[in-house]
Amino acid sequence: MESFAYVLILTLAIATLFFAIAFRDPPKIGK
């Protein structure tokens, strides 16, 4: 169960970084 929580926190951190960069700069990913 600890590994699941660790992966969840890690994914959340990566998602936060991704959204911070995506919203700060013009979205170049996808187009």
UniProtKB/Swiss-Prot annotation:
Predominant location category: membrane
Keywords for this protein: Membrane, Photosynthesis, Photosystem II, Thylakoid, Transmembrane, Transmembrane helix
Gene Ontology CC: photosystem II reaction center; plasma membrane-derived thylakoid membrane
Any single GO BP term: photosynthesis
Membrane topology: Single-pass membrane protein
SUPFAM superfamilies: Photosystem II reaction center protein T, PsbT (SSF161029)
UniProt keyword annotation of Transport present: no
Entries under Pfam families matching the protein: PsbT
Residue ranges crossing the lipid bilayer per the database entry: 3-23
UniProt subcellular location: Cellular thylakoid membrane
Family affiliation: Belongs to the PsbT family.
Protein purpose: Found at the monomer-monomer interface of the photosystem II (PS II) dimer, plays a role in assembly and dimerization of PSII. PSII is a light-driven water plastoquinone oxidoreductase, using light energy to abstract electrons from H(2)O, generating a proton gradient subsequently used for ATP formation.
Quaternary context: PSII is composed of 1 copy each of membrane proteins PsbA, PsbB, PsbC, PsbD, PsbE, PsbF, PsbH, PsbI, PsbJ, PsbK, PsbL, PsbM, PsbT, PsbX, PsbY, PsbZ, Psb30/Ycf12, peripheral proteins PsbO, CyanoQ (PsbQ), PsbU, PsbV and a large number of cofactors. It forms dimeric complexes.
Entry protein name: Photosystem II reaction center protein T
Organism: Parasynechococcus marenigrum (strain WH8102)
Taxonomic lineage from the root: Bacteria, Bacillati, Cyanobacteriota, Cyanophyceae, Synechococcales
Gene (name only): psbT
